[in-house]
Every structure is written in structure tokens, then in C-alpha cells.
């Protein structure tokens, strides 16, 4: 076994095939002459020419996914109006959640935790004026006017 090159990478690395200058290299190039441990056996069913992909490179946007839509969005499992119903609730993005200004500082952390647990969708919280916050704002503005009046004297 003279002139054996163990660094040639064929099917199994370091296969021990003879170097190209060896007289026995032509004989050992064919698979039938290789020892069984050096042979590359196909893994799976044989492919025909028609089954080969048309492109050489993997392009994920060309592949068709066979996964159902619910598997693509794992958070959607908790968004059902009716638990017996199989279809999850659909939301059009961007989602806006309206939060009253009167509840801005009252129990905000607990309510926000409950909100995130029951509504796990990326959304923008938009504050709105409710009846309680309108009266608070009027009182605040009248106090500011009175304070500013005292400062000017």
C-alpha cells in the first residue's frame, strides 16, 4: 500500500485512497473495487432526474410550506373568543389598545400584567380621555390658573 494519501475527502474523510500517480488508482476509482467501509451508499430512495430541484441553491421563498397557519404563530392559541371554536381570532395590524387616562397610575402594573397575559399581541397603547379624567383635567387647569394668578401679584 505505497503512495496512499489519507487526506483525500471522498464520501468518508481520510478514506485512504491511493494518490493519483499510483498505478492502481484507475482500478480503485470505481466503487466496486473500494472496500465496503469506503463506499458511499445513498440514504433514502433513489432520485431520478425529474425529481431533482431546478435550482442548485436553497431559496426559502421558493419552497412551499406545508405547515398550518396556527403553527407559524404559536401565540395565536390563546386568542380564541370561543374555546370550542378552532379558528383563532384574527387581528389587523397595527393593533391599538385604548387605555383611559384615569387609570394611568392606578394599579397600572397589575392591569398591564393581566393585559399581556390575555392579549399577547404586539400593540400600541393609546391613551384616551374618559369622564373621570376630564373632570380631573378641569380641576387641574383651574388650580394652575389660580396658582399663576397668585404668582403674578
From Swiss-Prot:
GO terms for cellular component: nucleus; transcription repressor complex. It is found in: Nucleus. It comes from the Eukaryota. InterPro entries: Ripply_fam (IPR028127). Expressed in the presomitic mesoderm (PSM) in the anterior halves of somitomeres S-I, S-II and S-III. Its main location: nucleus. Induction: Part of a negative feedback loop during somitogenesis. Expression is activated by tbx6 together with thy1 and tcf3. Keywords: Developmental protein, Nucleus, Repressor, Transcription, Transcription regulation. A motif (WRPW motif) lies at residues 58-61. Disulfide bonds: none annotated. Residues 127-153 are annotated as: Disordered. Residues 93-128 are annotated as: Ripply homology domain. Residues 131-153 have a biased composition (Acidic residues). Changing residue 59 to E: Disrupts transcriptional repression. One of its GO terms (biological process) is embryonic pattern specification. It holds the Pfam family Ripply. Belongs to the ripply family. The ripply homology domain is required for transcriptional repression. The WRPW motif is required for binding to tle/groucho proteins and transcriptional repression. Interacts with tle4 and tbx6, and mediates interaction between these proteins. Required during somitogenesis for the formation of somite boundaries. Represses the expression of genes involved in somite segmentation by acting with the corepressor tle4 to down-regulate the transcriptional activity of tbx6. May act by regulating the activity of tle4. Represses transcription of delta2, thy1 and ripply2.2/bowline itself. This is Protein ripply2.2. It comes from Xenopus laevis (African clawed frog). The lineage of its organism: Eukaryota, Metazoa, Chordata, Craniata, Vertebrata.
Amino acid at each position: 500500500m505505497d503512495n496512499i494519501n489519507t487526506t483525500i475527502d471522498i464520501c468518508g474523510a481520510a478514506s485512504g485512497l491511493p494518490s493519483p500517480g499510483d498505478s492502481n488508482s484507475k482500478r480503485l476509482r470505481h466503487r466496486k473495487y473500494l472496500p465496503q467501509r469506503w463506499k458511499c451508499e445513498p440514504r433514502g430512495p433513489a432520485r431520478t432526474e425529474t425529481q431533482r430541484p431546478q435550482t442548485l441553491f436553497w431559496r426559502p421563498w421558493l419552497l412551499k410550506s406545508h405547515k398550518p397557519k396556527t403553527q407559524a404563530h404559536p401565540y395565536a392559541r390563546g386568542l380564541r373568543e370561543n374555546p370550542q371554536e378552532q379558528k383563532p381570532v384574527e387581528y389587523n395590524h397595527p393593533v391599538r389598545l385604548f387605555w383611559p387616562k384615569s387609570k394611568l397610575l392606578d394599579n397600572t402594573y397589575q392591569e398591564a400584567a393581566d393585559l399581556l397575559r390575555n392579549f399577547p399581541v404586539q400593540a400600541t397603547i393609546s391613551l384616551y380621555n374618559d369622564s373621570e379624567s376630564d373632570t380631573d383635567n378641569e380641576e387641574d387647569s383651574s388650580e394652575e390658573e389660580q396658582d399663576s394668578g397668585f404668582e403674578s401679584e
